[in-house]
């Protein structure tokens, strides 16, 4: 049960990070200060 919970947390964190990174990369005009971040 603990392994399943850890796996779920890893998948959720991975999708959240992927969504945030993709959102920032595809919309640099909303965050002009983060252009040098990519």
Swiss-Prot record:
Q: Name one GO cellular component term.
A: photosystem II reaction center
Q: Where are the transmembrane segments?
A: 6-26
Q: Which domain of life is it from?
A: Bacteria
Fetch the InterPro entries from UniProt.
Answer: PSII_PsbI, PSII_PsbI_sf
Tell me the keywords, alphabetical order: Membrane, Photosynthesis, Photosystem II, Reaction center, Thylakoid, Transmembrane, Transmembrane helix
Predominant localisation class:
membrane
Quick check: keyword Cell wall biogenesis/degradation in the entry? no
Q: Which GO terms are recorded in the biological process aspect for this UniProt protein?
A: photosynthesis
Q: What is the topology of this protein in the membrane according to its UniProt annotation?
A: Single-pass membrane protein
Localization terms from the record: Cellular thylakoid membrane
Family that this chain belongs to:
Belongs to the PsbI family.
For this protein, the record's PANTHER family field holds: PHOTOSYSTEM II REACTION CENTER PROTEIN I
The subunit field of the Swiss-Prot or TrEMBL record says: PSII is composed of 1 copy each of membrane proteins PsbA, PsbB, PsbC, PsbD, PsbE, PsbF, PsbH, PsbI, PsbJ, PsbK, PsbL, PsbM, PsbT, PsbX, PsbY, PsbZ, Psb30/Ycf12, peripheral proteins PsbO, CyanoQ (PsbQ), PsbU, PsbV and a large number of cofactors. It forms dimeric complexes.
Q: What does this protein do?
A: One of the components of the core complex of photosystem II (PSII), required for its stability and/or assembly. PSII is a light-driven water:plastoquinone oxidoreductase that uses light energy to abstract electrons from H(2)O, generating O(2) and a proton gradient subsequently used for ATP formation. It consists of a core antenna complex that captures photons, and an electron transfer chain that converts photonic excitation into a charge separation.
Read off the HAMAP family from this record. PSII_PsbI (MF_01316)
Protein known as = Photosystem II reaction center protein I
* Protein's organism: Gloeothece citriformis (strain PCC 7424)
